[in-house]
UniProtKB/Swiss-Prot annotation:
Gene: panB
Protein family according to the UniProt entry: Belongs to the PanB family.
Binding, Mg(2+): D46, D85, E117
Main location, first listed in the record: cytoplasm
Pfam family, one: Pantoate_transf
Organism expressing this protein natively: Myxococcus xanthus (strain DK1622)
Annotated keywords: Cytoplasm, Magnesium, Metal-binding, Pantothenate biosynthesis, Transferase
Biological pathway: Cofactor biosynthesis; (R)-pantothenate biosynthesis; (R)-pantoate from 3-methyl-2-oxobutanoate: step 1/2
Subunit: Homodecamer; pentamer of dimers.
Designated name of the protein: 3-methyl-2-oxobutanoate hydroxymethyltransferase
Physiological role: Catalyzes the reversible reaction in which hydroxymethyl group from 5,10-methylenetetrahydrofolate is transferred onto alpha-ketoisovalerate to form ketopantoate.
PANTHER family the UniProt entry points to: 3-METHYL-2-OXOBUTANOATE HYDROXYMETHYLTRANSFERASE
Enzyme active site: E184 (proton acceptor)
Top-level EC class as recorded in UniProt: transferase
Length: 305
């Protein structure tokens, strides 16, 4: 295993010009696969409200749900840095509540850092969380928790005033102690300027190639939803098609009685005859066979190798 990725690793990547690869994960199996593929950072995004739970926004996601999914991802990751979103209304009410909830993601969920949305108005919140020894990643531009305020999922920072505000917010978050910053749904020229002005890494999603790294929702890059086609997503696979084909083949074999076949079934160790209607024999306790003598079902389901 390569060295564990930390926030200092990510800062060093920016300094040497090595791009940061970040992707969402919501369970241990995906975490293990994505880490094996080379992920530097695994983000447990509140996007799970949409891609896992079926909501039309991230707003219904709760702290308990974020802790649950964060813990699952942390169990599947060994090398990658694990960062978890603070969900809607988990940090906006007070700094005390923000620190408590950030602490839950670290203590109960096993996250290495947390991410929150918002600009200079949350600089004090960032300071409070960092003071509690919890690293914070910021998030500017198209911030999904502010979907109603923005009037939908629309590109941010196209006008000069809005672009200047995003730059000012980025500088404020860096000053407050954020170790990295997600830039979502902003023009590539603005993302380039912000990246050049900051000493901390920027990670883009729909923000052009000049950010210090990139992040995508794993379900999007894997082609799990053919009806979701945003401009900023490139599909590297068609898992929707592959899964449909594989599951369809399974269903077809079940319906025609072809599965399970002899290869996928178990046999008794000796011939057993059970006469119809015969009374059941008295129970006889046999000595336990050595564990190695029994036929094993296979590796423990779901546990990474």
């Amino acid at each position: 295993m390569k060295d564990k990725v930390t926030i200092h690793t990510l800062k060093r990547f920016k300094q040497i010009g090595q791009k940061i690869c970040m992707v969402t994960a919501y369970d241990a199996t995906f975490a293990h696969i994505l880490e094996e593929a080379g992920a530097d950072v695994l983000l447990i995004g509140d996007s799970l409200g949409m891609v896992i739970q079926g909501h039309d926004s991230t707003l219904p996601v709760t702290m308990d749900q974020m802790v649950y999914h964060t813990a699952a991802v942390a169990r599947g990751a060994r090398r990658a840095h694990v960062v978890a979103d603070l969900p809607f209304m988990s940090y906006q009410v007070s700094n005390q509540e923000a620190v408590r909830n950030a602490g839950r993601l670290v203590a109960e969920g096993g996250a290495g850092s947390i991410k929150l949305e918002g600009g200079a108005e949350f600089a004090d919140t960032v300071r409070a969380i960092v003071r509690a020894s919890i690293p914070v990643m910021g998030h500017l531009g198209l911030t999904p928790q502010s979907v109603h305020k923005m009037g939908g999922y629309v590109v941010q920072g196209r006008g000069e005033d809005q672009a200047r505000q995003i730059l000012d917010d980025a500088l404020a978050l860096e000053q407050a102690g954020a170790y990295a910053l997600v830039l979502e749904g902003v023009p590539m020229d603005l993302a380039r300027t912000v990246t050049q002005r900051l000493s901390i890494p920027t990670i883009g999603i729909g923000a052009g190639v000049d950010c210090d790294g990139q992040v995508l929702v794993c379900y999007d890059l894997l082609g799990m939803n053919p009806d979701f086609k945003p401009k900023f997503v490139k599909r590297y696979a068609n898992l929707h098609g592959s899964i449909t084909e594989a599951a369809g083949a399974y269903f077809a074999e079940v319906r025609k009685g072809a599965f399970p076949d002899e290869e996928h079934s178990f046999k008794a160790t000796k011939n057993i005859r059970l006469a119809p209607g015969a009374p059941a024999p008295a129970a006889r306790v046999e000595p336990s066979a050595p564990a190695e003598a029994g036929e094993k079902l296979g590796p423990v389901y779901g546990r990474p190798a």
